[in-house]
């Protein structure tokens, strides 16, 4: 290791850690028939605007780890959407990260479906290819509320209007994306793939620890519970979940109300679409 450069050394250490994690999770992978038990490794963020470089890095990491329960984490930047499709077409599992809007989510989901269609057209298997679409939650509330507070300070908004959306935009934004997930993966085009053994690309709720102490620790976990989803929680949220939470399928209801809430926030002067784009740029 001492002869490696900084970036190569970092990658080697990550490979060792992720390989160990994947081996630890392998029994779950086998038990669930490749449904769960995955470990993710991220391509370099310096490649976030490099389609060709991202594909090459994903293939290299996949081959080095040589385990079926690995996901290669790739950001959903405009340049990487084609890379995501190309990597999936090669039969490599992908964790698509840094999704903040329905617009970007739709591109990610369609890239997944297109990749499987391309494999099927070539007579290649679509079984056991797994992917998640990591959709971020709490960061949305944080940036929307900060933007609104700035508007209030500038005299461009009324402080009392905040109660209309306080702690609700992240969940609403996620529900809008989930409604799109249900529509896309119940379509005739995906049904044909499902008959060949294809799995849905599950939405993964990321950043689900509450950043504001006034919120219930498991707020996002409770509100986003639903079928075919994954939730990555920080340790404190896991402890709060174990201590007591009400888990019921709330995610499947309220899509229309979610759209109305986001529209209301926009009318108050908060540029939600622009803020969601800024979150992705900052995340990279």
Where are these regions (language model features)?
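Hydrophobic alpha-helical scaffolding
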Residues: 11-15, 47, 98, 167-171, ...
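Short catalytic-loop micro-motif centered on adjacent basic/acidic residues
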Residues: 70-74, 94-98, 275
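Flexible, acidic glycine-rich loops studded with aromatic residues
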Residues: 197-284
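Generic secondary-structure signature for well-ordered alpha-helical cores
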Residues: 23-30, 63-66, 110-121, 149, ...
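Residue-level signature of catalytic and energy-coupling elements of molecular machines
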Residues: 41, 87, 234
């Amino acid at each position: 290791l001492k002869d490696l450069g900084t970036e190569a050394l970092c990658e080697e250490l990550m490979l060792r850690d992720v390989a160990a994690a994947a081996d630890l999770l392998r029994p779950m992978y086998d038990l669930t028939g490749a449904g769960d038990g995955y470990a993710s490794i991220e391509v370099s963020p310096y490649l976030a605007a490099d389609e060709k470089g991202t594909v090459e890095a994903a293939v290299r990491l996949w081959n080095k780890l040589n385990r079926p329960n690995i996901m290669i984490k790739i950001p959903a930047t405009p340049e990487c959407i084609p890379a995501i499709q190309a990597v999936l077409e090669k039969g490599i599992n992908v964790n698509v990260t840094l999704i903040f809007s329905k617009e970007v989510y739709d591109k990610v989901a369609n890239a997944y479906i297109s990749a499987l269609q391309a494999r099927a057209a070539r007579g290649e298997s679509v079984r056991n290819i797994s992917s998640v679409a990591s959709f971020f939650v709490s960061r949305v509330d944080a940036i929307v509320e900060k933007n609104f507070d700035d508007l209030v300070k500038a005299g461009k908004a009324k402080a009392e209007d905040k109660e209309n959306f306080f702690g609700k935009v992240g969940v609403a934004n996620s529900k809008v994306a989930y409604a799109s997930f249900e529509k896309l993966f119940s379509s005739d085009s995906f049904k044909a793939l499902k008959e060949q053994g294809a799995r849905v690309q599950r939405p993964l709720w990321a950043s689900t620890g509450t950043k504001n102490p006034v919120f219930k620790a498991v707020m996002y976990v409770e509100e986003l519970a639903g079928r075919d989803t994954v939730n990555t929680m920080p340790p404190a949220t896991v402890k709060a979940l174990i201590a007591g939470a009400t888990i019921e399928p709330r995610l499947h209801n309220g899509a229309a109300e979610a759209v109305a809430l986001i529209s209301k926030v926009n009318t108050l002067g908060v540029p939600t679409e622009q803020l969601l784009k800024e979150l992705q740029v900052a995340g990279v």
